[in-house]
Amino acid sequence: MRHLPFHGMPLRVQMFCAFFIRSETTDKNKATPTITFMVSCCFVWVKRLFYRVGRIHHVQSLTYARPITALDSCLYVCCGYGEKLQPVGFVKSYVTNSQLDTLRVLLVGKDGAVYVHHMRAARLCRLASSTTEFTRRGLQRDAVTYEEDLELPDQRMCGTNARHLFDVIAAAADEHNLLTVGGLCQTHAGVSCNLLETVGDPWTAVPAARMTLTVPQVQYRLWPEARRDLRRHLYAGHPLGPWLVCGVLSRERETQKPSPPIRTTVGNVPTPGPREVEIAWVVLTLAGPLLAFWPDTGKICRLANSFSTLWKMGPRAMRGHWTYSAPGRHLPGDAWPLCEHVRPQVGKLPRKRAYLD
């Protein structure tokens, strides 16, 4: 129905236009496709209703369920070129249990268009034709207003591999003239990802633009130290290869005493609910393993071996992270590449339980 003049409008507007055309025309050649289109709209409505019911957390989710192609991550996102960064706003998934099921990487085209790459489905979607439009319209858009997903080579057989993600993003950059996400650097607003422009060879990257990822203001004081600690772990030329911060995990930190219920009074002080929240950045590496970095403590560890494991575990993956090799826990001589800067004494186990709670 792309030829119809109202293509791209909200579904209810399309239905009204189709009904108006059907009621005004007597030509069967025009009426038949219009009726077919109205029936297909009804199917889309039913499908969307089931989709929203499946993701429901409260009654309002039926009305405000986010479209599948929305960027659902607990991040502030700022887009722009150079030092002038244009804030987009707080982006958060309100209707999904796990933030991992909806991890996306935001991309900016050389022409200024904004794209989003859905990691799990290995799909690239065009969000807006410019950062200004993206800022104005934001992510609270109806699903039908999104442009169609871009055609990419279907390699989802190895979709759980991190290398596949880099390959897809590199291919998208070459095919659709995009800027891909590279390393991490520090700005006044927080941590920013360098946008790298691929020239010819997908593995050749040239700095082109900058995108900033920041968190709520209470964590601003953590950024300089966190960035320094992260650079200490993931130094230049690291064996794990290129890396990027692709999301933020948060869960209630396990404490000895359980948190009081919401709206209870403890010592004449009303408590807002769980107060200790553990936050970890999800770091994707080219070599494969997904890392978790705790900005408040500077700890870093292997979170999962693949996205499939991470999707299966959800935020619960943060509970068992000390089962992997970590500084102070690995055997002498068995230094994992992530821990090569920590040199334990050869011949005996390290006594100091570093990086542990």
UniProtKB/Swiss-Prot annotation:
InterPro entries: US22-like (IPR003360)
Start and end residues of each stretch annotated as Interaction with host p53: 107-187
Induction remarks: Detected as early as 18 hpi.
Record's signal peptide: none
Keywords attached to this entry: Activator, Host-virus interaction, Oncogene, Transcription, Transcription regulation
Keyword Ribosomal protein: no
Pfam families, alphabetized: US22
Protein's job: Involved in transactivation. Displays transforming activity.
Subunit structure comment from the entry: Interacts with host p53 and inhibits p53-activated transcription.
Entry's family note: Belongs to the herpesviridae US22 family.
Protein name: Transactivator protein DR7
Lineage of the organism: Viruses, Duplodnaviria, Heunggongvirae, Peploviricota, Herviviricetes
